[in-house]
Swiss-Prot record:
Residues 101-123 have a biased composition (Basic and acidic residues). It is found in: Plastid, Chloroplast. It comes from Guillardia theta. Homodimer. Part of the ribosomal stalk of the 50S ribosomal subunit. Forms a multimeric L10(L12)X complex, where L10 forms an elongated spine to which 2 to 4 L12 dimers bind in a sequential fashion. Binds GTP-bound translation factors. This is Large ribosomal subunit protein bL12c. One of its GO terms (cellular component) is cytosolic large ribosomal subunit.
Length: 129
């Protein structure tokens, strides 16, 4: 183990140019390629990274869902629903009474969050999907 530790200590003291020269000499002496050994590792990392990048991709369209409306808050929620959807009084009332129900679909994140906040301030429970 002492030999290995000595080699590690010597490698730590190498400059960048000396390390590059060492790699070149190892390639020639042992007939190996440092790039060929590193390429599969990089390819695996790149493919794993690409998969996670797709999973991390942020959603751009949201659906605002009215989950629950307490009976004593129906009128306030009804006003918010009408403002968000542009529905008439009867249509908005039917929508509020049919909860859980989507209020609006395909909204931007900012609009959906603002609508959710308005509904919650009026007393309703809302979610984004």
């Amino acid at each position: 183990m002492n030999k290995v530790q000595n080699i590690i200590d010597q490698l730590k003291d190498l400059t960048l140019l000396e390390a590059a020269d060492l790699v070149k000499q190892i390639e020639e002496t042992f007939n190996v390629s440092a790039t060929a050994a590193a390429a599969p590792i990089n390819m695996v990392a790149a493919t794993a990274g690409a998969g996670s990048a797709e999973a991390v991709e942020e959603k751009t369209e949201f659906d605002l869902i009215l989950e629950d409306v307490p009976a004593d808050k129906k009128i306030a929620v009804l006003k918010v629903v009408r403002g968000l959807t542009g529905l008439g009084l009867k249509e908005a009332k039917d929508l509020v009474e049919a909860a859980p129900k989507p209020i609006k679909e395909g909204m931007s994140k900012a609009d959906a969050e603002a609508g959710k906040k308005q509904l919650e301030e009026a007393g309703a429970k809302a979610t984004l999907k």
